[in-house]
């Protein structure tokens, strides 16, 4: 019996390592894609961490399917090969039917650093996540990261990221966020990754600043691009004029909002200061809504056309981005 169990485990892990990443959209994902390790429900593992540990030191492509539930875990993903996490959902095209939540509560001062406070620390290249909610439940009072994303070719599809201060640490690398929900109040999207946020809901749950980008040198190709996003306040809160599009964490922050809907939560000045001596590059083009008037904007630079995915994600973006989103 023990030998048979070992063989079964070997077969499961081997299948997960060989499984291809999904590049087509389904209306529902209520069972594991072929070859994935399984977590929760009737799956093999009870925790996400245990499933990830089972992948070991391989560099083969791998995937993990997570059944509906709330997983109280703090996770760091460092893996040599491409890794995809799938959450159970009845609608893969949106975050609204997500059933999987990963949650942890700790502040950066308590943890010792921003990254150490992250509920999910994706510290690898070729990391992809579908239809999973990531929460840092700390709330007001200190920085507390939900997702720390550090890597090339990272993709997040139909996910939710919830916190208050420093929710999403788009730290370094190249990242794509599609049809996601991102909630916070103070600097809740920050870092020096080059990141494209497409068709996302950017939701403020308090007065503050959406972005705190940390680009420092003119040679750094990084952008934060918000394309066809909806920018608004959390239901039940009156934040009229209380939210800024961003402030520069470092001196050459570069952010653009394009073809997006900006609600009345956006302060007429649009942008404000942070780093001493900063000369940020802040752009707006093609936006609509009560917060889109740029006539009183501060620190706004001119731009003649919306930026492209190639500009933000690099010339190889067509090779790794999930086209179904």
Swiss-Prot record:
<dbReference type="GO" id="GO:0045490">
    <property type="term" value="P:pectin catabolic process"/>
</dbReference>
<feature type="binding site">
    <location>
        <position position="247"/>
    </location>
    <ligand>
        <name>substrate</name>
    </ligand>
</feature>
<keyword id="KW-0961">Cell wall biogenesis/degradation</keyword>
<feature type="glycosylation site" description="N-linked (GlcNAc...) asparagine">
    <location>
        <position position="126"/>
    </location>
</feature>
<keyword id="KW-0325">Glycoprotein</keyword>
<comment type="function">
    <text>Involved in maceration and soft-rotting of plant tissue. Active against citrus pectin.</text>
</comment>
<dbReference type="GO" id="GO:0042545">
    <property type="term" value="P:cell wall modification"/>
</dbReference>
<dbReference type="GO" id="GO:0030599">
    <property type="term" value="F:pectinesterase activity"/>
</dbReference>
<dbReference type="InterPro" id="IPR033131">
    <property type="entry name" value="Pectinesterase_Asp_AS"/>
</dbReference>
<feature type="site" description="Transition state stabilizer">
    <location>
        <position position="165"/>
    </location>
</feature>
<feature type="signal peptide">
    <location>
        <begin position="1"/>
        <end position="18"/>
    </location>
</feature>
<keyword id="KW-0378">Hydrolase</keyword>
<feature type="active site" description="Nucleophile">
    <location>
        <position position="187"/>
    </location>
</feature>
<comment type="similarity">
    <text>Belongs to the pectinesterase family.</text>
</comment>
<feature type="active site" description="Proton donor">
    <location>
        <position position="166"/>
    </location>
</feature>
<keyword id="KW-0063">Aspartyl esterase</keyword>
<dbReference type="InterPro" id="IPR012334">
    <property type="entry name" value="Pectin_lyas_fold"/>
</dbReference>
<feature type="binding site">
    <location>
        <position position="249"/>
    </location>
    <ligand>
        <name>substrate</name>
    </ligand>
</feature>
<feature type="binding site">
    <location>
        <position position="143"/>
    </location>
    <ligand>
        <name>substrate</name>
    </ligand>
</feature>
<dbReference type="GO" id="GO:0005576">
    <property type="term" value="C:extracellular region"/>
</dbReference>
<keyword id="KW-0964">Secreted</keyword>
<comment type="pathway">
    <text>Glycan metabolism; pectin degradation; 2-dehydro-3-deoxy-D-gluconate from pectin: step 1/5.</text>
</comment>
<protein>
    <recommendedName>
        <fullName>Pectinesterase A</fullName>
        <ecNumber>3.1.1.11</ecNumber>
    </recommendedName>
</protein>
<dbReference type="InterPro" id="IPR000070">
    <property type="entry name" value="Pectinesterase_cat"/>
</dbReference>
<dbReference type="Pfam" id="PF01095">
    <property type="entry name" value="Pectinesterase"/>
</dbReference>
<keyword id="KW-0732">Signal</keyword>
<dbReference type="InterPro" id="IPR011050">
    <property type="entry name" value="Pectin_lyase_fold/virulence"/>
</dbReference>
């Amino acid at each position: 019996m023990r030998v048979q169990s070992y063989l079964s485990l070997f077969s499961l892990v081997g299948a997960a390592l060989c499984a291809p990443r999904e590049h087509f959209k389904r209306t529902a994902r209520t069972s594991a894609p072929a070859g994935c390790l399984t977590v929760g429900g009737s799956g093999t593992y009870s925790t996400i961490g245990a499933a990830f540990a089972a992948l070991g030191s391989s560099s083969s492509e791998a995937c993990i399917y997570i059944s509906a539930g709330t997983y109280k875990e703090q996770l760091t993903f460092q893996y040599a090969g491409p890794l995809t996490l799938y959450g159970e959902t009845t609608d893969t095209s949106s975050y609204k039917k997500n059933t999987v939540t990963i949650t942890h509560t700790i502040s950066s001062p308590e943890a010792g650093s921003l990254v150490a406070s992250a509920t999910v620390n994706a510290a690898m290249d070729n990391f992809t996540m579908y239809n999973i909610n990531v929460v840092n439940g700390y709330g007001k009072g200190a920085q507390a990261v939900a997702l720390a994303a550090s890597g090339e070719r990272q993709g997040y599809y139909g996910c939710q990221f919830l916190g208050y201060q420093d929710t999403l640490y788009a730290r370094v690398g190249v990242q794509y966020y599609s049809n996601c929900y991102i909630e916070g109040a103070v600097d809740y999207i920050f870092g020096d990754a080059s990141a494209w946020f497409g068709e996302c809901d950017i939701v403020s749950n308090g007065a503050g600043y959406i972005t705190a980008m940390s680009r420092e040198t003119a040679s750094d190709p990084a952008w934060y691009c918000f394309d066809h996003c909806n920018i608004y306040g959390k239901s039940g809160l009156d934040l009229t004029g209380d939210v800024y599009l961003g402030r520069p964490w470092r001196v050459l922050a570069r952010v653009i909002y394009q073809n997006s809907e900006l609600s009345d939560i956006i302060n007429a000045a649009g942008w404000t200061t942070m780093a001493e001596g900063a000369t940020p590059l802040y752009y707006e083009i093609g936006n609509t809504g009560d917060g889109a008037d740029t006539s009183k904007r501060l620190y706004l630079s001119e731009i003649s056309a919306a930026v492209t995915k190639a500009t933000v994600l690099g010339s190889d973006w067509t090779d790794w981005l999930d086209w179904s989103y």
